[in-house]
């Protein structure tokens, strides 16, 4: 480790990642931009992972390794983030791999665009052993605007492992929030967007690993609820409404219905929470999360809600599209969408 302040800090939370962590670390050390530090906080891993990390830290002084007692993902991420000294700070998960020019590209963009708080990029996908997985690329020319009060709320989303932001922006967010730990990357993007623009570049900057621990149906369901509630937290923040009480009641992986009801009451007529909730279930093909037996049951609920509520033209067009989609896909379940 060196006392010199680096240009860029990369932070990583590690937990029992012996099969992948060396590839992740080496991808940072091999960056074309070499003025960096890699802050790794290990979350109480066993010997195989720690042996690898200790060896790597001995071999390269740019690594700052902290061995911690088990504290969970959010606590470990925040501990690593707090140790970063660079004026620009990037994240990488312990099972993903940076492309060699990832940091150089993102630093160049942030230096050329002072109004941008954070920047991300696209990902290539691989399986547990590193084999490429073909994925449909999103249109890089499609512009998504940041609009928390739109219907539905619109977000420039940057996947966690591709994210780089200014240290000042990171500090202003207060870090990752544990109540949204199943969708912490979405929540942090909402928070960063309050500090400046968030930009998603069309360049592939990271290889993202897909394996059993991030593909399970239970993980998918928890992520969906967390994404929904994080967007409502962003709506509340945009409206200047304190949602601390509602957020403090969120039980990750538990019963989310009280939290949905809490935001419904908190936002009242300021935002159509019930309409958004039904729309979200339809768009995500996740009716079971709302207690509906199938897509047809959700479609019936949407129709009843539609008849009982006045509509403006733009919202009606969006809503009818979701309704038609739900009716066509009525036989699907959330498990098939996981």
Positions of predicted regions on the chain:
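Short, acidic, metal-binding catalytic loop of nucleotide-sugar glycosyltransferases
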Residues: 26-35
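Conserved nucleotide-sugar donor-binding catalytic segment
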Residues: 10, 82, 99, 121, ...
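Acidic helix N-cap motif at the loop->helix transition within catalytic regions
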Residues: 20-22, 47-55, 77, 97, ...
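Glycine-rich, basic loop-to-helix element that forms the pyrophosphate-binding segment
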Residues: 67-84, 105
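C-terminal subregions of glycosyltransferases and related glycan-biosynthesis enzymes
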Residues: 210-338
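Short aromatic/hydrophobic "clamp" motif used to bind/position activated sugar donors
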Residues: 89
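A conserved acidic beta->alpha catalytic loop
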Residues: 27, 42-51, 70-71, 93
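Conserved donor NDP-sugar-binding/catalytic core segment of glycosyltransferases
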Residues: 101-134
């Amino acid at each position: 480790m060196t006392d010199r302040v680096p240009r860029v800090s990369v932070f990583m939370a590690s937990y029992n990642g012996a099969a992948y962590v060396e590839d992740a670390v080496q991808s940072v050390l091999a960056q074309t931009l070499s003025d960096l530090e890699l802050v790794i906080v290990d979350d109480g891993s066993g010997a195989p992972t720690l042996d690898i990390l200790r060896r790597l830290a001995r071999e390269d002084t740019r690594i700052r390794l902290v061995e911690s007692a088990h504290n969970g993902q959010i606590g470990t991420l925040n501990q690593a983030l707090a140790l970063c000294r660079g004026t620009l700070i990037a994240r990488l998960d312990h099972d993903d791999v940076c492309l060699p020019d990832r940091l150089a590209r993102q630093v160049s963009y942030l230096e050329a665009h002072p109004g941008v708080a954070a920047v991300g990029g696209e990902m290539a996908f691989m399986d547990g052993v590193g084999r490429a997985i073909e994925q449909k690329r999103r249109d890089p020319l499609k512009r998504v605007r940041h609009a928390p009060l739109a219907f539905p709320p619109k977000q420039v989303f940057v996947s966690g492992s591709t994210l780089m932001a200014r240290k000042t922006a990171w500090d202003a967010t207060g870090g990752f929030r544990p109540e949204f730990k199943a969708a912490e990357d979405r929540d942090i993007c909402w928070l960063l967007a309050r500090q400046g623009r968030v930009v998603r570049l069309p360049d592939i900057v990271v290889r993202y690993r897909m394996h059993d621990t991030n593909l399970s149906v239970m993980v998918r369901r928890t992520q969906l609820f967390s994404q929904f509630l994080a967007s409502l937290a962003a709506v509340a923040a945009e409206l200047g409404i304190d949602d601390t009480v509602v957020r403090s009641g969120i039980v990750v992986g538990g019963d989310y219905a009280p939290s949905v009801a809490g935001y419904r009451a908190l936002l009242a007529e300021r935002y159509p929470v019930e309409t958004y909730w039904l729309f979200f279930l339809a768009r995500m093909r996740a009716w079971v999360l709302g207690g509906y037996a199938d897509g047809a049951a959700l479609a019936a609920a949407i129709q009843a809600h539609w008849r009982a509520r006045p509509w403006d033209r733009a919202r009606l067009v969006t809503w009818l599209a979701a309704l038609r989609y739900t009716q066509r896909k009525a036989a699907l379940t959330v498990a098939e969408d996981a």
